[in-house]
Amino acid sequence: MEDNEENKEKKTTLEDLPGVGEATAEKLRENGYDDIMAIAVASPKDLSDVTGIGEGAAAKIIAAARKFADIGNFETGEEILERRKTIQKLTTGSKNLDDLLGGGLETQAITEFFGEFGSGKTQIMHQLAVNCTMPKEKGGFDSDVMMIDTENTFRPERIIQMAKSKGLDPDETLKRIHVARAYNSHHQILLAEKAQETAKEFNIRLLIVDSLTAHFRSEYVGRGSLAERQQLLNKHMHDLLRFGTIYNAVIAVTNQVSARPDVFFGDPMAPIGGNIVGHTATFRVYLRKSKGGKRIARLIDSPYLPEGETVIQISEEGVNDGT
């Protein structure tokens, strides 16, 4: 047993994994796979694509990395509970919404906010970006933020407003928010893949994608392209989830809705992305407009929290309870 522990301590580089020589290790590092955990949560196809080795060989490398990282095996419920103690929660700025989400947005999970135009999705993303830079005692992570902006909706002026209302230095807050504009779905996927490079230079604990599905929706039109769209969207979401797992980060995404023509009673609106997004997002929050600056937030999916809804307010100061 002691020998196994010693071997684990020694095996700290990619070259220590069986089947990984200098050339393969270099290709892996160039593509963001530069530690054992990154290899352990990868798929054989991903490693095969970036290194040129066969999927069988890639699977063996991943299996060895998982053994070293001590993941991928059966665990007791007690062990999982202990591991979940590493999970942290980021405040939304609204106590009502925090309570609905069990204390805020969880790390190592994807939280999706979906709704019609003007429902407050982008406002919440801006607020989360500001909140992430706040001290831990105020519900933040005192860390940097990465945002993939697909619709050119990021506004530094809004960040300044929100930062001032929180008593933060707006210039310092802006310096800690790293924004990349995604011009199409493939560029969006590439930015998510390369996010790890930025995370190594800065302490990134929040990754935002606003909006998750806009490019996929506009580029893949018709039933003939649906399978390809869903395949790419699936890969993209798993890249995001992997980032959250490796860096113990919050993943927050926005999503658009469309009307279902077959629904005659009740709310006909449904989020874009179908089962792929529905099954991969850990928490799903439906936002609807109400009177004035009020919004109704409904939690419709969670692994352990009950469905429910609450009222929040979006004002000049940001996202709050309006009291």
From Swiss-Prot:
Q: Which UniProt keywords apply?
A: ATP-binding, DNA damage, DNA recombination, DNA-binding, Nucleotide-binding
One Gene Ontology MF term: ATP binding
- UniProt record, GO biological process: DNA recombination; DNA repair
Transmembrane parts of this sequence: none
Per the UniProt entry, the signal peptide is none
A Pfam family found in this protein is: Rad51
Q: Where does ATP bind?
A: 115-122
Give the SMART domains listed for this entry: AAA, HhH1
Function field: Involved in DNA repair and in homologous recombination. Binds and assemble on single-stranded DNA to form a nucleoprotein filament. Hydrolyzes ATP in a ssDNA-dependent manner and promotes DNA strand exchange between homologous DNA molecules.
By its UniProt entry, which PANTHER family does this protein fall under?
Answer: MEIOTIC RECOMBINATION PROTEIN DMC1_LIM15 HOMOLOG (PTHR22942:SF30), RECA/RAD51/RADA DNA STRAND-PAIRING FAMILY MEMBER (PTHR22942)
Protein family according to the UniProt entry: Belongs to the eukaryotic RecA-like protein family.
State what protein this is by name: DNA repair and recombination protein RadA
Organism of origin is Thermoplasma volcanium (strain ATCC 51530 / DSM 4299 / JCM 9571 / NBRC 15438 / GSS1)
- What lineage is this protein's organism placed in? Archaea, Methanobacteriati, Thermoplasmatota, Thermoplasmata, Thermoplasmatales
